[in-house]
C-alpha cells in the first residue's frame, strides 16, 4: 500500500515546482505516484483501488468539498492540503476530525514533507489494522528462533524436501510464518482470552454490535455446539427449528436433551420458508410440550436466520415474543446484517438487550465475508455465566488454533468498519439488484423462454422484500405480515417447468441441467432445487463474475434452443455413461427428467414430506447411545417405514433433516420415504443425476441403504 494521488498540475510555478520536488522525494520514500485528471477521476480511483494511502491537493481549488467526498469513501485516508499565505482556512472543529494535514507551498521542503507523509501513512496503516493481526504481523517480521510447535518452523522444514518446496512455493512464506504456536506469549491465548486475542474479541464485539464475541476456528458447526452445550443442560428441553443445520442435529445426539420442533413452511418450488408466527406463541409451545414425551418448558431455543434461500426474520418480534430465557439465532449465512440499514431488526444482535433473556448469534464469517474457511464467530447480548460458557468453548476448541484463521476473522471485521465497510456491503446489495434487473430485462426481450427470478414483480430499490400475505410471487400459503423478508443478495433463478404455486407445465427444464452446464464452464451454483438455482452475491462477487453468470445463462438458452447433443453441450455428463447419452439431445434429457418429476407429483410430494413429521420414539441422544453400543443394522431404504432411524437422513439439496436419529416413519409420514425414493429414481434413470442423501449409502448394486436400530427381541 504505497500509492499517493496528486491533484495537479496547476499551471503556476510557485505551486507546481514544490509539488515536482515532493514527487521525487516521495518516490525516494518508496511511494508510487499517480496523477488523476480531476476530482471525479480521483474519487473513482479511490473507490476501486483500496491500496491508495494518501491524496495531495490544492486547498484553494478543492477545499472541504473534496475532503467530504473522500471521507464518504474512506474517512481514515490521509489527506494533504497545500496552502499559500493567502489561503482562507475555513475549517470547523468537526472538520479537523478528518485525517487532514496542511502544508505550505515552499521550495526546499520536499524531503521533510515526504518523511512526514511516510509517518502519517504508517499511522494510517496502523490505525486500520486490528490488534491481533497487527501483533501477528509484528511477530512474523521479528523472525525469532523458536524451539516449539509447529514442526515446520515457519516453513523451514518444507524447504528440506522437493514436495515440501512445492507446498512452500504455493502458499508463500508469510502464510507459514504466521502459523505459530500458542507458546508465543506476546500473542496471548485464544482459550484464556488474553493479550491480543482478547483485544481482537473486544474489537469484533464493538464492530458487530455485540456485548461479547468469541472467535471460533473450526466453523459455525462448532459454534452451534458450544452455544448448545452451555445453554441446554442434560435433561432439559430444547425448542429447535426443524430447518436446522446438521451440526445442531449432532448437538442433539451429543447432549441428553429433549427436542421440541418448530415447524417451518416451504413452497412448491422447494424453497425453505420460515417458522410461522403461530409457532412462537405460548399456546403453541404448550401443545408441543404436552405432546412430547419427557418434555418440559424449554430453556433454550434455536432459530435459523436466515434460511438457506435467504429469508430473514423480524428478529425483534421473536426476541420480544418467544417466552424462552435463551435464544440462539444460527446466522451462519448472514454475517453482514449489522452493516446495512435494510437489515435493521432482522439479526440477532440488532436492538438493545431484552430483559430476562440472553441472545446468542453464530455467524460463518468465511461464508459471505473475507475470512478463511472455518472462521466463525459467536456473539452474545445479555447476562450469562462467562466461566461456564468458556468451559463449553474450551471443550470444543483445539489447543492449537490456527492464528491465520484468527487474523482473518479480525480482518473481516476491520473491513466492515466505517464508510469503507458500509460501501462494501452496499456494493454487494447494489450488484445483486442490478443482476436481478438484467435477468428481468433479458426475460422481457427474449424470443421465447428465459429464466425468471424468485422475487416481487417490482424490485426498483434495494430492500429486504417482505413475504407478505396475499401475494403470489413467493408461493407461501398463509404468510404472516411483517415476519419474513427476502435478502436481496441471495438470488434464486427459476427455470421453466413449474410456477410458485406448484402448477407444472407440459414442458420444463429441470435446474440440475443448468447447474451442470454452468459447472462445466467454471461457474459453481450454491444450491440446486427441482426448478431453481441459488446464487450468493457476497462481497467477493465483482461485475466480471456477475456478467459471467449472465453470459452462462444466455449461452444455456442458446444451446438449449439449438437442441445440441449431450456430447457437445455437456461433455462431462456424457462421460458418465457414453452409451446412454450417445444419441441424446438436451431437450430429450430435459423433458425426460421433467416427465419423471411430473409422474411423481414432486411439488405435492415434497410439501407433504416436510409437513408431516415422523414419530419420535426416543431422543437423538438415546438413539446415538444405542448406535455406539452396536445395536444397529442396515436395511434397504424402501424398508424404512416402521423402523427407528439410527442416523439423520437428509437429501442435499436442501440439506434439511427429513428424519432424525430416534425417529420412525409411520403410515402418516410415509410420504417422507416416497420423496426420498423419488429422488433416488432420477439417478437410476439418468446417470450423473444421483441424489446425495446424507445418512443413506448407495451400494454397488445401486440400492440405497440406511442404518436403523435393532428391534427388541
Residue ranges and their predicted role:
Residues 36-45, 58, 68, 220-440:
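Conserved PLP-enzyme active-site core in the AAT-like
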Residues 64-87, 378-380:
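A short, gly/pro- and small-residue-rich
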Residues 1-3:
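Extreme N-terminal starter segment of soluble prokaryotic enzymes
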Residues 163-254, 260:
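Long, structured ligand/cofactor-binding scaffold of large enzymes
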Residues 29, 75, 95-98, 255-256, ...:
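Short, structured coil segments at secondary-structure junctions
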Amino acid at each position: 500500500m504505497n500509492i499517493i494521488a496528486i491533484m495537479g498540475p496547476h499551471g503556476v510555478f510557485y505551486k507546481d515546482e514544490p509539488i515536482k520536488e515532493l514527487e521525487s522525494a516521495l518516490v525516494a520514500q518508496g511511494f508510487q505516484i499517480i496523477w488523476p485528471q480531476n476530482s471525479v477521476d480521483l474519487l473513482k480511483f479511490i473507490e476501486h483501488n483500496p491500496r491508495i494511502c494518501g491524496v495531495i491537493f490544492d486547498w484553494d481549488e478543492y477545499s472541504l468539498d473534496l475532503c467530504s467526498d473522500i471521507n464518504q469513501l474512506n474517512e481514515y485516508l490521509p489527506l494533504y492540503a497545500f496552502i499559500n499565505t493567502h489561503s482562507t482556512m475555513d475549517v470547523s472543529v468537526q472538520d479537523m476530525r478528518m485525517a487532514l494535514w496542511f502544508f505550505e507551498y515552499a521550495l526546499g521542503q520536499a524531503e521533510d514533507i515526504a518523511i512526514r507523509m511516510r509517518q502519517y501513512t504508517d499511522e494510517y496503516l496502523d490505525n486500520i489494522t486490528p490488534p491481533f493481526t497487527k501483533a501477528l504481523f509484528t511477530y512474523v517480521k521479528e523472525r525469532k528462533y523458536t524451539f516449539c510447535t509447529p514442526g515446520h518452523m515457519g516453513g523451514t522444514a518444507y524447504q528440506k524436501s522437493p514436495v515440501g518446496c512445492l507446498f512452500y512455493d504455493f502458499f508463500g512464506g508469510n502464510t507459514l510464518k504466521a502459523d505459530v504456536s500458542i507458546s508465543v506469549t506476546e500473542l496471548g491465548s485464544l482459550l484464556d482470552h488474553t493479550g491480543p486475542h482478547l483485544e481482537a474479541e473486544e474489537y469484533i464485539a464493538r464492530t458487530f454490535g455485540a456485548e461479547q464475541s468469541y472467535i471460533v476456528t473450526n466453523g459455525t458447526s462448532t459454534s452451534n455446539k458450544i452455544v448448545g452445550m452451555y445453554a441446554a443442560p442434560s435433561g432439559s428441553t430444547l425448542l429447535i427449528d426443524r430447518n436446522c443445520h446438521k451440526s445442531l442435529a449432532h448437538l442433539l445426539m451429543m447432549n441428553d436433551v429433549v427436542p421440541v420442533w418448530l415447524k417451518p413452511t416451504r413452497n412448491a418450488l422447494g424453497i425453505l420458508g420460515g417458522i410461522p408466527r403461530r409457532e412462537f406463541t405460548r399456546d403453541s409451545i404448550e401443545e408441543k410440550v404436552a405432546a412430547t414425551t419427557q418434555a418440559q418448558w424449554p430453556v433454550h431455543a434455536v432459530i435459523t436466520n436466515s434460511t438457506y434461500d435467504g429469508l430473514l426474520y423480524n428478529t425483534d418480534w421473536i426476541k420480544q415474543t418467544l417466552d424462552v430465557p435463551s435464544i440462539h439465532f444460527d446466522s451462519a449465512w448472514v454475517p453482514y446484517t449489522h452493516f446495512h440499514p435494510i437489515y435493521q431488526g432482522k439479526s440477532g444482535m440488532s436492538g438493545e438487550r431484552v430483559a430476562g433473556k440472553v441472545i446468542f448469534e453464530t455467524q460463518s464469517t468465511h461464508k459471505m465475508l473475507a475470512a478463511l474457511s472455518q472462521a466463525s464467530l459467536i456473539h452474545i447480548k445479555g447476562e450469562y455465566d462467562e466461566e461456564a460458557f468458556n468451559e463449553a468453548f474450551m471443550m470444543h476448541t483445539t489447543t492449537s488454533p490456527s492464528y491465520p484463521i484468527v487474523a482473518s476473522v479480525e480482518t473481516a471485521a476491520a473491513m466492515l468498519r466505517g464508510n469503507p465497510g458500509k460501501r462494501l456491503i452496499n456494493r454487494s446489495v447494489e450488484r445483486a439488484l442490478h443482476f436481478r434487473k438484467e435477468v428481468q430485462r433479458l426475460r422481457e426481450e427474449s424470443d421465447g423462454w428465459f429464466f425468471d427470478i424468485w422475487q416481487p414483480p417490482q424490485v426498483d430499490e434495494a430492500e429486504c422484500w417482505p413475504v407478505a400475505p396475499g401475494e403470489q410471487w413467493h408461493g407461501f400459503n398463509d404468510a404472516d405480515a411483517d415476519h419474513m423478508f427476502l435478502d436481496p443478495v441471495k438470488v434464486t433463478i427459476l427455470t421453466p417447468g413449474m410456477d410458485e404455486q406448484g402448477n407444472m407445465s407440459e414442458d420444463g427444464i429441470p435446474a440440475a441441467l443448468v447447474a451442470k452446464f454452468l459447472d462445466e464452464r467454471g461457474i459453481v451454483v450454491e444450491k440446486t432445487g427441482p426448478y431453481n438455482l441459488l446464487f450468493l452475491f457476497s462481497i467477493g462477487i465483482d461485475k466480471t463474475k456477475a456478467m459471467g453468470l449472465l453470459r452462462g445463462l444466455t449461452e444455456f438458452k442458446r444451446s438449449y434452443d439449438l437442441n445440441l447433443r449431450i456430447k457437445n453441450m455437456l461433455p462431462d455428463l456424457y462421460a458418465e455413461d457414453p452409451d446412454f447419452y450417445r444419441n441424446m439431445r438436451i431437450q430429450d434429457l430435459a423433458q425426460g427428467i421433467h416427465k419423471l418429476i411430473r409422474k411423481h407429483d414432486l411439488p405435492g410430494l415434497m410439501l407433504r414430506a416436510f409437513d408431516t413429521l415422523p414419530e419420535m420414539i426416543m431422543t437423538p441422544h438415546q438413539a446415538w447411545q444405542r448406535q455406539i453400543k452396536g445395536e444397529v443394522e442396515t436395511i434397504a431404504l424402501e424398508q424404512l417405514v416402521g423402523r427407528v432411524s439410527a442416523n439423520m437422513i437428509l437429501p442435499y439439496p436442501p440439506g434439511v433433516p427429513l428424519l432424525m436419529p430416534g425417529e420412525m416413519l409411520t403410515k402418516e409420514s410415509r410420504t417422507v420415504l416416497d420423496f426420498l425414493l423419488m429422488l433416488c429414481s432420477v439417478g437410476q434413470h439418468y446417470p450423473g443425476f444421483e441424489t446425495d442423501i446424507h445418512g443413506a449409502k448407495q451400494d454397488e448394486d445401486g440400492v440405497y441403504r440406511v442404518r436403523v436400530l435393532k428391534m427388541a427381541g
